[in-house]
């Protein structure tokens, strides 16, 4: 075969290149230049179509390439050639002019590189449309703070694309590429309005627009030339508000700081110079730890934390905001320490006085303390009372100890409360001073006869010697016998010794003013009373020698007390001097109180809660003619205050309420009932002579001591004589013999009363003598005789002599018995 022609060989090679281009292989021109992208053709759908392709390197497009196009219509042979141009280096562009483009037009395109065909294809303009860019873009300012963009349609009105275009508007900030706006204009009019406040005020903006034909499946046109403007407008109030608020805050802060520093400066230069008592050194009180109460101290955990300086400054600056918080913190801390005392944890809100808080000075803690000091003793009497056992301790005795001072004060208060309680209950106490006891005088009339004997004091040698040296001088009686030696004796009052109110005394006063046993005999009134004798009672002869007193040792404390009181009253009294004994007897104190009250001219004493038996006997003598009642086993001369007869003017006396349960009197033995006979002429001792037999042996000590203890017990003054339930004297007696009046016990206690009336107690209830005629001395024990002052030889003191006025019959054995008139005793309670 021969060689192929060169033209055929080149044609085959081009076909291979086209096939390779369709499969991604570039075609190489004969000059050695490669084509990277084949031509892309677009039409503006008016008169021009544009084709462009990209080369691998810089190429002179007009010298190397030729593009020919031909309308395919009825096999026309009219070919048109387009010379390409260079754009952007390696891009070749060729503009093809076409007349009256319609939708059905189709063109054949061929790309030649010299004589070599590189590419050929058909092109339909209606399917490859690229609209023209809009023209005449302009921006207009509106009165209503809006911007208006206008442009013109690139196509004439008779074109098919005139009514088919849509636009895209781009507004961007010249100084900030990120600040841009995109608006789609889908309506037919080539205009756009947008508010100026959507853009930043004072910034330069530019706008551009491009078109797109959606129906022809076109691409976006090129951007139109841009238009620029400066965006400026007046901002509304809501946009200016943040700036105004920030400026206001800064201004307020500056004002507050200036005020604070101004107040600090004023405080240093003016306020601190004002004199303040709190800064005085005299206010600072140094207190020792021993003088501070334990409950006034705070533990370290309870001490409030110091407020920092910044909080103090803010409190002064803004008191309304911080004062409530401080109060709530303090309340919460107190509630945490003290526990939930007010229910729900709700802090008590208190209004704050701003005017006082802003310029209030810094508080200075001043410790306030209360110190107790002993009062200075003003007179010598108070010092003497303190030295003699007052309840108020002196500073020397206390040793400067604060604890002992408090104990002394507590002792004073306790004594005062106790005395006030006694005064309220009995109606007989009137507290006048601390550490004093209330003693009321039992006697109203100093000259009233007292049917009671006085005996020397037990254990006092002076009393016994004085009793021997100063015997009593009663009138002699021919009918007197040793058993008839009981007589009536007037008990005088003692002179006033204490000048203050006698109704309220202390034991220290009695200590300092207690007298010796001879004090009674030194009193002139007592001497007169010793010389007075009842006219109806004959006196017994005075023995030549004083009988020796028998003083057996008492068995109980009652006997000791009674014996001491009786001996004290019977002892002669020398000149008053300092007492060597301990406390004075209560009866003697009552007697002194009586004289003081009478000397002061006071009325009837209704304040005394308790009376001595001798005072009641004296009161009975003041109302003659009322003692005609027949006594029973439970009746005696002593009565409670509510049982006094209403005939006496001084009858109303408050009833004692404190008895202490010590006034229970044992019942008499059934073999010794009291004698019923008594005289109504005058109260006193009345004899009942039944016989002269004195040789009967005496009774046993137990049988004789009980009646004597019951009879002599009425002579002491203490609060246990009256029943605290019924007001009667506490006695328990058996039924009387011989059809006498029956004494029944009260339903609430064991006291005896006759027909509901308060019973009376006989001070000298002698046991009934046996029918054989045993004398009184025989029925008493030696101890009882010693207490009565009767010797074993049968001699008795003349003060106890008894007249034989009541002798029953000659057939009976005469026996002398000392009896009291049971009539109501009228007495003055002052």
Curated annotation (Swiss-Prot):
Q: Where is the composition biased (Acidic residues)?
A: 378-387, 518-534
Subcellular location(s): the record lists: Membrane
Q: Where is the short sequence motif ITIM motif located?
A: 716-721
Q: Which cysteines are joined by disulfide bonds?
A: 41-51, 82-94
What GO molecular function annotation could you give as one example from this UniProt entry? cytokine receptor activity
User: Which region is the signal sequence?
Assistant: 1-32
Record flagged with keyword Iron = no
Can you give the residue ranges of the Fibronectin type-III domain?
133-232
Its subunit composition reads: The functional IL4 receptor is formed by initial binding of IL4 to IL4R. Subsequent recruitment to the complex of the common gamma chain, in immune cells, creates a type I receptor and, in non-immune cells, of IL13RA1 forms a type II receptor. IL4R can also interact with the IL13/IL13RA1 complex to form a similar type II receptor. Interacts with PIK3C3. Interacts with the SH2-containing phosphatases, PTPN6/SHIP1, PTPN11/SHIP2 and INPP5D/SHIP. Interacts with JAK1 through a Box 1-containing region; inhibited by SOCS5. Interacts with SOCS5; inhibits IL4 signaling. Interacts with JAK3.
Q: What is this protein called?
A: Interleukin-4 receptor subunit alpha
What's the name of its gene? IL4R
């Amino acid at each position: 075969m021969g060689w192929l022609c060169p033209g055929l060989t080149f044609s085959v090679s081009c076909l291979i290149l086209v096939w390779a281009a369709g499969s991604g292989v570039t075609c190489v021109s004969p000059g050695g230049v490669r084509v990277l992208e084949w031509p892309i053709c677009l039409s503006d759908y008016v008169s021009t179509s544009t084709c462009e392709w990209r080369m691998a390197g810089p190429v002179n497009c007009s010298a190397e390439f030729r593009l020919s196009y031909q309308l395919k219509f009825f096999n026309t042979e009219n070919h048109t050639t387009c010379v390409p141009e260079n754009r952007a280096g390696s891009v070749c562009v060729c503009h093809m002019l076409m007349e009256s483009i319609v939708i059905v037009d189709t063109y054949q395109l061929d790309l030649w590189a010299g004589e070599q065909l590189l590419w050929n294809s058909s092109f339909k303009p209606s399917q490859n449309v690229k609209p023209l860019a809009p023209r005449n873009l302009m921006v207009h300012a509106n009165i209503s703070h809006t911007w208006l963009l206008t442009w013109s349609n690139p196509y004439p009105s008779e074109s098919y694309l005139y009514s088919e275009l849509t636009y895209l508007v781009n507004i961007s900030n010249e100084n900030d590429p990120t600040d841009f706006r995109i608006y789609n204009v889908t309506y037919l009019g080539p205009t756009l309005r947008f508010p100026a406040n959507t853009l930043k005020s004072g910034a330069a903006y530019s706008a551009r627009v491009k078109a797109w034909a959606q129906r022809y499946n076109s691409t976006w046109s090129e951007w139109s030339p841009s238009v620029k403007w400066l965006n400026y407008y007046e901002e509304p109030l809501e946009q200016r508000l943040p700036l105004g608020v920030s400026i206001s805050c800064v201004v307020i802060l500056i004002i507050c700081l200036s005020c604070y520093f101004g107040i600090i400066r004023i405080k240093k230069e003016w306020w601190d110079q004002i004199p303040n008592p709190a800064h005085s050194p005299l206010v600072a009180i140094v207190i020792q730890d021993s003088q501070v109460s334990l409950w006034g101290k705070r533990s370290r955990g309870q001490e409030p934390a110091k407020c920092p300086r910044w909080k103090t400054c803010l409190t002064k600056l803004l008191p309304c905001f911080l004062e409530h918080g401080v109060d709530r913190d303090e309340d919460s801390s107190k509630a945490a320490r003290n526990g939930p005392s007010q229910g729900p944890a709700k802090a008590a809100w208190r209004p704050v006085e701003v005017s006082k808080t802003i310029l209030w000075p810094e508080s200075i803690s001043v410790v306030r303390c209360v110190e107790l000091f002993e009062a200075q003793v003003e007179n010598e009497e108070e010092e003497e009372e303190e030295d003699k056992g007052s309840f108020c301790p002196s500073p020397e005795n206390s040793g400067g100890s604060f604890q002992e001072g408090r104990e002394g004060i507590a002792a004073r208060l306790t004594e005062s409360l106790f005395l006030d309680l006694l005064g309220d209950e009995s109606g007989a106490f009137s507290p006048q001073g601390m550490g004093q006891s209330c003693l009321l005088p039992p006697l109203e009339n100093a000259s009233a006869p007292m049917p009671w004997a006085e005996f020397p004091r037990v254990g006092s040698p002076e009393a016994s010697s004085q009793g021997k040296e100063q015997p009593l001088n009663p009138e002699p009686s021919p009918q007197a016998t040793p058993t008839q030696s009981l007589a009536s004796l007037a008990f005088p009052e003692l002179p006033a010794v204490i000048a203050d109110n006698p109704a309220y005394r202390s034991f220290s006063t009695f200590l300092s003013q207690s007298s010796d046993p001879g004090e009674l005999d030194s009193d002139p009134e007592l001497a007169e009373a010793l010389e007075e004798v009842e006219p109806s009672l004959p006196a017994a002869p005075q023995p030549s020698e004083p009988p020796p007193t028998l003083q057996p040792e008492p068995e109980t404390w009652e006997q000791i007390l009674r014996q001491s009181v009786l001996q004290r009253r019977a002892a002669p009294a020398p000149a008053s001097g300092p007492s060597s004994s301990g406390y004075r007897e209560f009866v003697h104190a009552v007697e002194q109180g009586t004289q003081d009250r009478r000397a002061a001219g006071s009325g009837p004493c209704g304040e005394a809660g308790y009376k001595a038996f001798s005072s009641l006997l004296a009161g009975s003598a003041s109302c003659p003619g009322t003692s005609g009642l027949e006594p029973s086993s439970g009746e005696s001369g002593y009565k409670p205050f509510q049982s006094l007869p209403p005939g006496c003017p001084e009858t109303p006396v408050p009833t004692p309420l404190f008895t202490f349960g010590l006034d229970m009197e044992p019942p008499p033995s059934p073999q010794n009932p009291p004698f019923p006979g008594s005289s109504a002429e005058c109260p006193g001792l009345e004899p009942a002579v039944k016989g002269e037999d004195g040789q009967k042996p005496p009774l046993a000590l137990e049988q004789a001591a009980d009646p004597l203890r019951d009879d002599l017990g009425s002579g002491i003054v203490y609060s246990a004589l009256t029943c605290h339930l019924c007001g009667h004297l506490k006695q328990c007696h058996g039924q009387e013999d011989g059809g006498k009046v029956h004494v029944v016990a009260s339903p609430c206690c064991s006291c005896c009363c006759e027909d509901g009336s308060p019973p009376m107690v006989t001070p000298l209830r002698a046991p009934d003598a046996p029918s054989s005629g045993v004398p009184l001395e025989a029925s008493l024990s030696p101890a009882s005789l010693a207490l009565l002052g009767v010797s074993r030889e049968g001699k008795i003191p003349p003060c106890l002599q008894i007249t034989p006025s009541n002798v029953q019959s000659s057939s009976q054995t005469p026996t002398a018995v000392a009896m009291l008139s049971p009539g109501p005793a009228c007495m003055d309670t002052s």
